[in-house]
């Protein structure tokens, strides 16, 4: 078995972990939820949810991963003494692998749109852009080629290991992502009428904070930090023993939230400057925003082209950092459980993800057996992993760390064996035992339409 690596610097560790959390949902979900649910009032609720749910869940996975010093499955197995709790770790590995398969498809779309933006293929009216996306996504070959491309890029990073691959790449990609984001934010906010978008995003309206808004904030705080995918636990495997887990969780959460808010500043001023309600989801990114950029920067087409290229490059970088963390979950599992080299494990994971990606991509075409029950195969992967596996895994992880793992072990990891202040340990344990499981259960039932 290959020698275990670790992160060489605290900055590299934070950027890699934050890169795993920052993804396409920060762009196509959080800004719209914020604008529709009271602006700054929703952001305040969301921050409270991150503190009450996201950070305790992340801390729990940090503790399991660092103490277990193994892949996610083995870490749960070691802490549980090999009993049934180990299957929660196996669920995390499986969830991360399945998500990677269909997430790579959308990530490939981002790469295609970088190419299309640069060569002017997205120039046209709203109907043209909508037709372009429908034609591209249903094509049997082009999306698969781009899916393969982004998986190969990810694989090349993973093959180089933790320090030379994941950490070094994160140190390059995350600052680049942030710079591109700031450039587009400035360009968007300077547009005539852009202030209406900023008002929509930030003006507090507490009358919109109903039960759906609270549950939406809870769900977003859980999903946005990549909880229960195995990513957090696997990266904690590479933490140094002196890493302050609470401080790291706070820093990762802050970066993730900051990027999500900046994404709103990137989207809404441009959309409102041309009178478009941007909406959410993939249609926002691949249909609405190309049209918005075409209209908003019509007077200076070169600027519009650059903004579009930068935007999809930004999305591609966010997708790659997320895919890196998802890939490493399964790669670390195969290395330790099958005693194979990193190169071989990474190749197997890439091949398996590509197979899933091919079928998910083809489900957008007219192949009848890839759509059933009112959903495409892509939608089924999204539904099963996002609305069942993730909340179940998060719920069980909270019960595991809160009740099954010895309190002293949890306290020792939380406080770095007494070298870090433990004044909030009791608060953390209370939340992970009672508040987090209740919140996750509420989100789970709400998503299934129970209430």
Predicted regions: what they are:
Residues 1-28, 55-62, 66-79, 83-90, ...:
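Membrane-interface "cap" regions at the ends of multi-pass membrane proteins
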Residues 12-49, 236, 247-250, 254-257, ...:
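Transmembrane helix-boundary motif of multi-pass solute transporters/channels
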Residues 319-325, 346-360, 364, 379-413:
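Hydrophobic alpha-helical segments of multi-pass membrane transport proteins
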Residues 2-7, 167, 171-320, 344-345:
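Membrane-embedded translocation segments of transport machinery
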Residues 2-5, 32-37, 67-91, 104-163, ...:
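Inter-helical loop and helix-membrane interface segments of multi-pass membrane transporters/permeases
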Residues 371, 376-400, 421-451:
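A generic transmembrane alpha-helix motif of multi-pass inner-membrane proteins
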Residues 6-17, 42-45, 84-97, 145-150, ...:
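Select transmembrane alpha-helical segments in multipass membrane proteins
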Residues 74, 107-138, 238-242, 247, ...:
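Helix-loop-helix connectors at the membrane interface of multi-pass transporters/channels
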């Amino acid at each position: 078995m290959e020698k275990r690596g670790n992160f060489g610097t605290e900055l590299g560790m934070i950027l890699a972990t934050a890169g795993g959390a920052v993804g396409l949902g920060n762009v196509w979900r959080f800004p719209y939820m914020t604008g529709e649910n009271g602006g700054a009032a929703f952001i305040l609720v969301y921050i409270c949810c991150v503190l009450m749910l996201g950070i305790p869940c992340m801390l729990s996975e940090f503790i399991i991963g660092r103490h277990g010093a193994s892949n996610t499955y083995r870490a749960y197995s070691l802490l549980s003494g090999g009993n049934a709790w180990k299957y929660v770790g196996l669920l995390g590995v499986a969830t991360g692998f399945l998500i990677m398969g269909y997430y790579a498809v959308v990530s490939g779309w981002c790469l295609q749109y970088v190419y299309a933006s640069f060569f002017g293929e997205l120039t046209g009216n709203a109907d043209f852009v909508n037709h372009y996306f429908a034609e591209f996504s249903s094509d049997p070959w082009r999306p698969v080629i781009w899916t393969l491309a982004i998986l190969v890029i990810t694989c090349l990073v993973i093959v180089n290991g933790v320090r030379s691959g994941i950490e070094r790449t994160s140190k390059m990609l995350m600052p680049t992502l942030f710079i591109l984001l700031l450039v587009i934010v400035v360009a968007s906010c300077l547009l005539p009428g852009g202030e209406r978008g900023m008002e929509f995003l930030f003006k507090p309206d507490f009358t919109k904070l109903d039960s759906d808004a609270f549950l939406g904030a809870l769900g977003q705080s859980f999903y946005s930090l990549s909880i229960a995918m195995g990513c957090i636990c696997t990266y904690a495997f590479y933490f140094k023993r002196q890493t302050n887990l609470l401080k790291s969780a706070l820093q990762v959460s802050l970066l993730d939230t900051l990027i999500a808010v900046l994404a709103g500043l990137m989207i809404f001023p441009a959309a409102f400057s041309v009178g478009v309600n941007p909406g959410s989801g993939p249609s926002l990114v691949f249909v609405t925003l190309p049209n918005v950029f075409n209209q908003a920067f019509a007077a200076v087409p070169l600027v519009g082209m650059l903004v579009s290229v930068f935007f999809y490059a930004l999305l591609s970088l966010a997708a790659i950092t997320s895919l890196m963390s998802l890939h490493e979950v399964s790669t670390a599992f195969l290395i330790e459980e099958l005693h194979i080299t990193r190169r071989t494990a990474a190749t197997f994971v890439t091949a398996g993800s590509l197979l899933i990606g091919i079928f998910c991509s083809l489900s957008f075409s007219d192949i009848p057996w890839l759509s059933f029950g009112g959903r495409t195969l892509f939608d089924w992967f999204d539904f099963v992993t996002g609305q069942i596996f993730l909340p179940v895994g998060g719920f069980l992880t909270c019960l595991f760390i809160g009740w099954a793992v010895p309190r002293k072990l949890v306290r020792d990891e939380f406080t770095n064996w007494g070298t870090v202040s433990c004044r909030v340990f009791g608060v953390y344990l209370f939340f992970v035992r009672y508040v987090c499981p209740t919140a996750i259960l509420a989100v789970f039932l709400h998503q299934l339409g129970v209430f």
